Amino acid sequence: MNNKVNIAVLVSGGGTNLQALINAQKSGIITSGEIKLVVSSNKNAYALKRAENAGIKTVVCERKDFSQKAFEDNILNALEKEEIEVIVLAGFMSILSADFVKRYPERIINVHPSLIPSFCGEGFYGLRVHKAALDYGVKVTGATVHFVNEIPDGGRIIMQKAVEINENDTPEILQKRVMENAEWIILPAAAEKVCKEIKERKNERI
């Protein structure tokens, strides 16, 4: 009996974090869950190709084509069709409403490229986060995987990993190091942790 937890990954761009999740599934790091669906807010996202290559179903819901409610309703329909239990935001560039988030309490996870509570919240995304860390002069940064609630980057922390900052770092160099040494490691590990806990709770009810 396959009682794996159904995972959806929401993307908008290149999908390097999605690839880390796919690789982790293949290598046995993620065993309690299975990626059943990739939803992209951008029809040209390379992440869709990565999903296709891995044999994962894809759905495109372009934000610009809909009101916020219609956009989210389309995503929810796709999630419900695949009986999705856990949602991973992997470079998803649209903010989800409080109503959407409330439907999946402690079931939506996001990776943020800093050690929350530093350099997070509204306006902190992509290279901006790394530029802020360098401008501030911190010696250590990293990545955080957290649950998503109605406050940007405000949900409970699941996992963090620190990355040292070097003297000659640029935002681009730092971004690459944080991705490779932190994000690509803790996002799959956190996804497995959340899925394992859900699976255990389901088994207790049987």
Please identify what each model-predicted range represents.
Residues 1-206:
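One-carbon transfer enzymes
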